[in-house]
């Protein structure tokens, strides 16, 4: 059994929508990033990579490489999960916490869970996504960006 933790943050800027959890969420601004800026999937990638002792997303998909410019984070997540399977592990469960004052995530949570479960080749009840605010405190509370944390449990593949 292995546990991994991931964290990511991106600042708002430019045109919307926000891509998060593999889902397009309408908002007047997008997130500034080298890829599509999906903080949820980036945190999840880091959690998975941490659990298999393979560093972080920046090591595998560096923002200094134009190959990853505008990259679809779902493709990155699938690539990371391929590495997890190559190491002999499978997902036990994943828990993702989005920290954002805006946009409201509730209408999109189920679609996020569906996308993540599909990309991680697992049952829907092995994936949880939730959103919270920081009670108007800090950069997320001032609507300057979005943060996300993810925790995964990996089990030996059968």
Curated annotation (Swiss-Prot):
In terms of Gene3D superfamilies, this protein maps to: 2-C-methyl-D-erythritol 2,4-cyclodiphosphate synthase
Report quaternary structure and partners: Homotrimer.
Keyword annotations of the record:
Isoprene biosynthesis, Lyase, Metal-binding
Cofactor binding, note field: Binds 1 divalent metal cation per subunit.
Q: Which organism is it from?
A: Aliivibrio fischeri (strain ATCC 700601 / ES114)
Q: Which is a GO BP term held by this UniProt record?
A: isopentenyl diphosphate biosynthetic process, methylerythritol 4-phosphate pathway
**UniProt entry tagged with the keyword Hydrolase:** no
Cofactors (names): a divalent metal cation
- InterPro entries membership: MECDP_synthase, MECDP_synthase_CS, MECDP_synthase_sf
Signal peptide coordinates: none
Q: Which domain of life is it from?
A: Bacteria
Pathway assigned in UniProt: Isoprenoid biosynthesis; isopentenyl diphosphate biosynthesis via DXP pathway; isopentenyl diphosphate from 1-deoxy-D-xylulose 5-phosphate: step 4/6
Function (record text):
Involved in the biosynthesis of isopentenyl diphosphate (IPP) and dimethylallyl diphosphate (DMAPP), two major building blocks of isoprenoid compounds. Catalyzes the conversion of 4-diphosphocytidyl-2-C-methyl-D-erythritol 2-phosphate (CDP-ME2P) to 2-C-methyl-D-erythritol 2,4-cyclodiphosphate (ME-CPP) with a corresponding release of cytidine 5-monophosphate (CMP).
Q: Which PROSITE patterns match?
A: ISPF
- What is the similarity comment for this entry? Belongs to the IspF family.
EC supergroup of this enzyme: lyase
Site location (Transition state stabilizer): 34, 133
Matches recorded under NCBIfam families:
ispF
Residues that coordinate or bind 4-CDP-2-C-methyl-D-erythritol 2-phosphate: 8-10, 34-35, 56-58, 61-65, 100-106, 132-135, 139, 142
Q: Which residues bind a divalent metal cation?
A: 8, 10, 42
Question: EC number(s) of the enzyme?
Answer: 4.6.1.12
Q: Which reaction does it catalyse?
A: 4-CDP-2-C-methyl-D-erythritol 2-phosphate = 2-C-methyl-D-erythritol 2,4-cyclic diphosphate + CMP
MF annotations from Gene Ontology = 2-C-methyl-D-erythritol 2,4-cyclodiphosphate synthase activity; metal ion binding
Q: Which PANTHER family match?
A: 2-C-METHYL-D-ERYTHRITOL 2,4-CYCLODIPHOSPHATE SYNTHASE, CHLOROPLASTIC
Q: What HAMAP family does the entry give? A: IspF
Its recorded name reads: 2-C-methyl-D-erythritol 2,4-cyclodiphosphate synthase
């Amino acid at each position: 059994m292995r546990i991994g933790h991931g964290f990511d943050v991106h600042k708002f800027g430019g045109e919307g929508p926000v891509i998060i959890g593999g889902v397009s969420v309408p908002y007047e601004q997008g997130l500034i990033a080298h890829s599509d800026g999906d903080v949820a999937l980036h945190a999840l990638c880091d959690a998975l990579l941490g659990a298999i002792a393979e560093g972080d997303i920046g090591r595998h998909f560096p923002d200094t490489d134009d190959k990853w410019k505008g990259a679809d984070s779902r493709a990155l997540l699938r690539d990371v999960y391929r590495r997890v399977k190559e190491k002999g592990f499978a997902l036990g469960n994943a828990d993702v916490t989005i920290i954002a004052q805006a946009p409201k995530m509730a209408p999109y949570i189920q679609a996020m869970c569906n996308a993540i479960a599909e990309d991680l080749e697992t049952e829907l009840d092995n994936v949880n996504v939730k959103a919270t605010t920081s009670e108007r405190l800090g950069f997320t509370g001032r609507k300057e960006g979005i943060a996300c944390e993810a925790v995964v449990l990996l089990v030996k593949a059968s």
